[in-house]
A protein has these predicted regions:
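Acidic, Ser/Thr-rich intrinsically disordered and amphipathic helical segments
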Residues: 34, 63-70, 110, 122-125
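Short cysteine clusters
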Residues: 58-61
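N-terminal leader/targeting and pre-domain segments
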Residues: 1-47, 122-139
């Protein structure tokens, strides 16, 4: 399991900004307003939100990104978000992010679970558990 500390960041190369973090059913949150909108949407739709607090310069975050996208495709009953800790510094600080990646699981805007670090098996286990809490509706 790996993680990057959010303090004393390495030199950032902006050319790869958000590379590999978005896609599939993953939404990159770039403003507090988009965060509020997505949480409101999730509450309305009865979805649990999985939030990945991440950084483009963080090796373990980059390693987890494709796996996170795969999970978003496999579990469409959940809402998958990514917050770049460097873009939303004050917001990330308000969530007490000490290391990246940090994953939060939210139901109706409240934390129901958390995982710190790039631990694929544990993330998958928590996503499956969260998915089991969501009523599955056939269209």
């Amino acid at each position: 399991m790996g993680h990057c500390l959010t303090k004393n960041q390495q030199d950032k190369d902006e050319s790869d900004h958000h590379v590999d973090f978005a896609g599939a059913n993953v939404t990159v949150i770039t403003t507090k307003e988009s965060w509020d909108q997505k949480l409101s949407e999730a509450s309305r739709d009865g979805k649990i939100v999985v939030v990945n607090f991440s950084a483009t310069w963080c090796g373990p975050c980059r390693m987890m990104a494709p796996f996170y996208r795969e999970l978003s495709e496999k579990y469409p009953s959940l809402m998958f978000l990514v917050v770049d800790v460097d873009e939303l510094i004050d917001f990330s600080t308000s969530w007490d992010i000490k290391a990246t990646p940090t994953f939060f699981f939210l139901k109706d805007g409240q934390q129901v679970d958390k995982l710190v670090g790039a631990n694929k098996p544990e993330l998958q286990k928590k996503v499956i558990a969260a998915s089991d809490l969501v009523p599955h509706v056939q269209n």
